[in-house]
């Protein structure tokens, strides 16, 4: 990054988009999001599904990166279909930051299928085989099968979902007795 005078986002964008399908390499995915969850850049060569409209699953580490600005965070993410990905995320600042104007803080997520973990330097301290380290994620709340998710913000579109107005939880879509 410093050798070529590029930003973290530029490096992530380049390793994702400058791949030649005829040459071996790691198929990455990359996304950029703001703190409100809006995805403003998405590329997926790894096969992970990135939502086209709305935000992604709040369990993706691209969102938790906002809790530790500037620090690269690595995670093992497991989709509802069983596919595993290793993902890194880090915040970046955009804008000039003149007096009276704030800079924009964005988060950049970069990842690949877990089978490439040994070739991805940021995952050397992750135990890919340890199921306890896996973070269960989905694409987005409206398409996710994880009905017991404590971070569910919307009911699933593809399943009947009963809301009990007499039950209190972290959200009207989550019962505290079933949340994980």
Predicted regions and their residues:
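Conserved binding/catalytic microenvironments
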Residues: 1-147, 151-180
